[in-house]
């Protein structure tokens, strides 16, 4: 049973990161294709940056899981530092996007990017010093920072509706939960925990899309994204409902045959 749980968790991560690569790639392609119909260039650049960060995170983690499964050891600490630094900058672009239309000094945006830079520095310092990457201190700092930024968006973005502020804050809180999990023991968790903890980058991208491209652009993206997600959920459901029980049955049957022969 434990082995099947680990297989399910591994499958969740592989599917999740593959879907993440596809969705962020789709975001980048659609921004470039529909750039003349969207908002000003600064917003396009922000969404392209989001897509680039999401691709770095998901590609890095996908490669890491494949490397651990098919080869000896993990990935280079420098590659891990790049991957986790990209994840750490995603909350910053969320805050940036949330304050893009506000007048005045965007102190929360500056604070978010400062925190992301600090976390990235800690990841690369850990890699250079030969310590474990990601840096637990960096992830813990970003957990606290994400909660503080979510509170700041709720309190200080006075011009935005409560619905918008709640969506921004919820995306940041999902990231906070993910960072808190990643800063602790990451081995032997259930597939549900792995789903919540490792796939926090997807709600961040969907939040930015929903807020900035609510109409045709978001609808076009969501039609493709939902089809891809449903296909992935179907594959995972078939594994849990069909493949895993069959594998467990065959393992038990083989052990019984071996015992009878002995």
Please give the residue ranges for each predicted region.
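Membrane-helix interface segments in multi-pass membrane proteins
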Residues: 1-2, 204
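Interfacial "cap-and-anchor" motif at the non-cytosolic start of specific transmembrane alpha-helices
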Residues: 160-262
């Amino acid at each position: 049973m434990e082995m099947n749980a680990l297989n399910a968790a591994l499958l969740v991560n592989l599917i999740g990161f593959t879907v993440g690569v596809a969705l962020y790639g789709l975001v980048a392609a659609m921004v470039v294709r529909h750039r003349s119909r969207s908002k000003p260039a600064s917003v396009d650049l922000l969404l392209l940056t989001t897509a680039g960060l999401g691709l770095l995170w998901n590609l890095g983690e996908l490669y890491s899981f494949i490397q651990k499964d098919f080869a000896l050891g993990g990935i280079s600490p420098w590659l891990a530092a790049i991957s986790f630094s990209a994840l750490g900058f995603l909350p910053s672009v969320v805050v940036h996007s949330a304050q893009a239309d506000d007048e005045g000094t965007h102190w929360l945006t500056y604070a978010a990017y400062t925190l992301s830079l600090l976390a990235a520095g800690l990841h690369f310092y850990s890699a250079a010093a030969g310590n474990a990457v990601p840096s637990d201190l960096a992830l813990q700092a970003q957990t606290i920072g994400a909660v503080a930024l979510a509170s700041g968006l709720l309190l200080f973005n006075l011009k935005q509706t409560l619905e918008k502020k709640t969506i921004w804050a919820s995306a940041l809180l999902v990231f906070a939960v993910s960072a808190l999990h990643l800063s602790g023991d990451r081995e032997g968790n259930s597939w549900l925990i792995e789903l919540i903890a490792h796939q926090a980058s997807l709600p961040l991208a969907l939040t930015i899309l929903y807020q900035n491209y609510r109409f045709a652009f978001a609808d076009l993206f969501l039609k493709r994204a939902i089809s891809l997600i449903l296909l992935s959920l179907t594959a995972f459901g078939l594994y849990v409902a069909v493949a895993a029980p069959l594998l467990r049955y065959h393992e038990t049957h083989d052990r019984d045959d071996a015992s009878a022969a002995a």
